[in-house]
């Protein structure tokens, strides 16, 4: 083998392997210290792009879960307040039934009305003050808002919160009263025992309901018969013997038309709008009508509470799905980008050994040209 002084090929070879081992060692240290096997585009350009897209999706899913939880919190806040609204309406109904009893004097009914007025004020206070993050929930101003429960645009769900004030038309309906009162001697006559209600239901469908009373029935029995034949309207009788018909806005849209022989005998008058805000139990007739008004309001509140319950259940399922997606997205991102510590530790040990070996060989290779000096000896 030739002895060269100007060119030390062995040293150059050792230097090349040392550089490679050092670079590999630095790469392993970077991966182990950062926890990522992709730290720049040069490590894996395609993998970096995919992992970044997955990271964006994961962050979006995290935000979507927070949004969904906010939606649940709003629904829970509203539904909790509406639970108290239900309690108030139930108490008002109890008081109305109490006032309708004939054992009460005028002064006692006035006292009952005072409590109903106070309860009505509290019902409205709850509707006006229930809020979440500064947004009023139950006074009609919340209306409909969207909740972003997905990682991409367009993945939103709408939530509607209805007006729970007592003067809301859906917290009542329309009252119709017969022009003439019927005393205890009045009876349903043969050939004039039918009354037909023509109306539109809440979905806008035409409804025609015919009730045939029995010959000889008195006015109280007529009211009982109507209530037994249909739930679209509620019938009662006031202290003057006048038939009262109430159509709740949660069931009937628009006015009710009356026809038939019995309707002609009763001579039903034009309707008057009534809500929980306007109920008056200082008379028997008013107390009877109040029960129907409050029943309509209770159905309205209960229906909306059911909607909020369904909304909460839907969002709970949405959160479970988002968590599942996020788990799989992060698992995929981890497989692409995260460091395999067992594998990388092995690579680091290998590069350290090669680095040490290359350094030792390089030191020996640098001594080779000294052999030329011995020839000059």
Swiss-Prot record:
Its main location: secreted. One of its GO terms (molecular function) is structural molecule activity. It is found in: Secreted; Bacterial flagellum. Pfam families: Flagellin_C, Flagellin_IN, Flagellin_N. Residues 103-129, 310-339 form a coiled coil. GO terms for cellular component: bacterial-type flagellum; extracellular region. The keyword Disulfide bond does not apply. It comes from the Bacteria. InterPro entries: Flagellin, Flagellin_C, Flagellin_C_sub2, Flagellin_hook_IN_motif, Flagellin_N. Keywords: Bacterial flagellum, Coiled coil, Secreted. Belongs to the bacterial flagellin family. V.cholerae is able to differentially regulate the flagellins within the flagellum maybe to produce flagella which are particularly suited for motility within a given environment. Flagellin is the subunit protein which polymerizes to form the filaments of bacterial flagella. FlaD is not essential for flagellar synthesis and motility. Heteromer of multiple flagellin subunits including FlaA, FlaB, FlaC, FlaD and FlaE. NCBIfam families: PRK08869.1-1, PRK08869.1-3. This is Flagellin D. The gene is flaD.
């Amino acid at each position: 083998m030739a002895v060269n002084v100007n060119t030390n090929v062995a040293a150059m070879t050792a230097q090349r392997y040392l550089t490679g081992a050092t670079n590999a060692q630095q790469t392993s240290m970077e991966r182990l210290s950062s926890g990522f096997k992709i730290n720049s585009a040069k490590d894996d350009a395609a993998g970096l792009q995919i992992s970044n897209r997955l990271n964006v999706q994961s962050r979006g899913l995290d935000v979507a879960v927070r949004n969904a939880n906010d939606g649940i919190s709003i629904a829970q806040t509203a539904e909790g307040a509406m639970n108290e609204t239900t309690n108030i309406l139930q108490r008002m109904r109890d008081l109305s039934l109490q006032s309708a009893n004939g054992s009460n004097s005028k002064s006692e009914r006035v006292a009952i009305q005072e409590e109903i007025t106070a309860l009505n004020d509290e019902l409205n206070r709850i509707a006006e003050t229930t809020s979440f993050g500064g947004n009023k929930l139950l006074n009609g101003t919340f209306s409909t808002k969207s909740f972003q429960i997905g990682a991409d645009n367009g993945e939103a769900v709408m939530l509607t919160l209805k007006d729970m004030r007592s003067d809301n038309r859906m917290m009542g309906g329309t009252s119709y009263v017969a022009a003439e009162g019927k005393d205890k001697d009045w009876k349903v006559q043969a050939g004039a025992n039918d009354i037909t209600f023509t109306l539109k239901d809440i979905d806008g469908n035409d409804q025609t309901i015919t009730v045939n009373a029995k010959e000889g029935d008195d006015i109280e029995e007529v009211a009982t018969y109507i209530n037994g034949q249909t739930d679209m309207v509620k019938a009662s009788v006031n202290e003057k013997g006048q038939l009262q018909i109430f159509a709740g806005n949660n069931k009937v849209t628009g006015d009710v038309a009356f026809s038939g022989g019995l309707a002609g005998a009763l001579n039903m008058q034009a309707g008057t709008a009534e809500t929980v805000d306007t109920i008056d139990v200082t008379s028997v007739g008013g107390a009877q009508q109040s029960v129907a008004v409050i029943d309509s309001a209770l159905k309205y509140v209960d229906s909306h509470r059911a909607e909020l319950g369904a909304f909460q259940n839907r969002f709970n399922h949405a959160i479970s799905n988002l968590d599942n997606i996020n788990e799989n997205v992060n698992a995929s991102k981890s497989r692409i980008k995260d460091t395999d510590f067992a594998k990388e530790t092995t690579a680091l040990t290998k590069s350290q050994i090669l680095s040490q070996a290359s350094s030792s060989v390089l030191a020996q290779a640098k001594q080779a040209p000294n052999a030329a000096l011995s020839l000059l000896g």
